[in-house]
Regions:
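Phosphate-group recognition and catalysis centered on beta-loop-alpha active-site segments
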Residues: 9, 17-296
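Basic side chains
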Residues: 2-6, 43, 74, 298-301, ...
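Beta-rich interaction/scaffold domains
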Residues: 296-371, 377-378, 391-403
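Alpha-helical protein-protein interaction elements
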Residues: 35, 98, 308, 386-388
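Gram-positive cell-envelope targeting signals
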Residues: 1-28, 364-409
Length: 409
């Protein structure tokens, strides 16, 4: 009981002081992410509630806790940038079929009302890049710019002028040679996400290794194949070569980018345990909640591990010590690597069971050479002794009666 009370006290103290998070150097985690942190990317902003590529969608995603928002950009006739996937507005917003962003000025584009996810006209307008960058800076988050590689030099100048280099990333599926050239041109000041889509392991490994050496911040991998090479841990080990800190990214919002998987927690569990630390999703609420629960589990697991370290091993059986040692090893592995919610929950379950078994067994184990006597044990000994004496008296009387019956009168 004392051990159990001790465990509860330690757990309570740790939970009260649980304002800090586990810090593990990137070198200790090999091919995975620094501090075991999973990065959430909202594809197009929170367009479940607001029209995609609207200012409200971008800001809402950041408010929900997204680390990054990915947006596509197009350039207007007067050289300004707005958020949109296609130059033809009609491909995204039916009422404007045939209207090209490249043929309109920024002022004209800003007057266009865009449709919501149900196709109804809203009061929202297309967000220009300036507003999106300002939102990223205000929330101290990151904007990932897609489809802007052809404007990369102009975008770089624009981002520098906005003092937003630390809040902006450009994503491209350009060749590794073009990406390396641009990184060299900018001195690596602007972060780049290089994207490889395919299923040839030699090409994928070469792409990852080359861009890692060049200082690419993130490399995204994608394939339609459910059993593609990008899901192979030996492939993902390329991210850990020579201690480069490049992160592995995957997009789950489109099944064609993640081997026909769904944009759900079960998929995130699987991909994180394979080595992906940056996930792009359409369900930003769900992913942010999932990452939050991972953080809580890490804190709980650290608390339980600390409790296991401080238990008095003199009161433990050899079997209990082995069980707790095995559980601690699993917990340490989960805490010092990139781990999914599922992996952390399993580690917590194992160490909780070991501690519970240990707290019960402590009541039944006595240290060698120490006699432990309690009032209950004394009473039990007295009762057993009394029963033995009563039995002997009864037997003696019965024998006397039998002898008396056999004696001649």
């Amino acid at each position: 009981m004392k051990a159990l009370k001790k465990l509860f006290t330690l757990a309570l103290a740790a939970l009260i002081a649980a304002g800090t998070t586990l810090c593990v150097s990137a070198a200790d985690i090999g091919p995975y992410s620094e501090n075991g942190k999973i990065i959430s990317v909202s594809h197009g902003g929170n367009w479940g509630e607001y029209p995609i590529y609207s200012k409200a969608a971008v800001e809402s995603a950041f408010e929900l806790g997204a680390d990054c928002v990915s947006v596509s950009v197009k350039r207007t006739a007067d050289g300004q940038f707005v958020l949109c996937k296609d130059n033809d507005l009609g491909k995204l917003y039916a009422p404007y079929k045939g209207q090209l962003i490249s043929a309109l000025s920024l002022e004209q584009v800003s007057q266009i009302r865009i449709t919501d996810s149900f196709g109804a006209l809203s009061d929202n307008r297309l967000c220009d890049l300036a507003d999106a960058v300002d939102a990223a800076k205000r929330f101290d988050r990151t904007l990932i710019i897609d489809d802007g590689w052809e404007y990369r030099k102009e975008l770089y100048s624009y981002i520098v002028d906005k003092d937003a280099v630390s809040n902006t990333v450009i994503r491209t599926d350009a060749s590794k040679g073009d990406i390396k050239e641009f990184l060299a041109l900018t001195g690596g000041a602007l972060r780049i996400v290089g994207s490889y889509y395919g299923n040839i392991i030699f090409n994928a490994r070469s792409y990852v290794t080359s861009l890692s050496k060049a200082g690419c911040a993130i490399v995204e991998l994608g394939t339609k194949n459910p059993f593609g090479v990008i899901f192979n841990k030996s492939m993902l080990s390329a991210f850990g070569k020579n201690n480069y800190l490049t992160r592995a990214m995957i997009s789950t919002y489109d099944p064609d980018l993640c081997g026909q998987r769904t944009d759900t927690e079960s998929t995130w569990n699987d991909l994180i345990d394979r080595g992906y630390s940056v996930i792009e999703t359409n369900d930003i609420k769900g992913l942010v909640n999932y990452i939050g629960r991972i953080s809580s589990l890490r804190t709980e697991l650290m608390t339980l591990t600390a409790s296991a370290e401080k238990l008095d091993k003199n009161n433990c059986s050899a079997k209990s010590l082995q069980e707790i040692s095995d559980a601690k090893a699993v917990a340490a592995q989960a805490l010092t690597t990139l781990s999914s919610h599922e992996a952390l929950a399993e580690a917590k379950h194992n160490i909780t069971l070991a501690l519970n078994d240990l707290s019960v067994s402590n009541e039944n184990h006595v240290r060698k050479g120490v006699l432990k006597i309690s009032a209950g044990k004394i009473i039990a000994v007295i009762l057993v002794t009394a029963a033995i004496v009563a039995g002997q008296v009864y037997t003696y009387k019965m024998q006397r009666k039998k002898k008396a019956a056999k004696s001649p009168s």
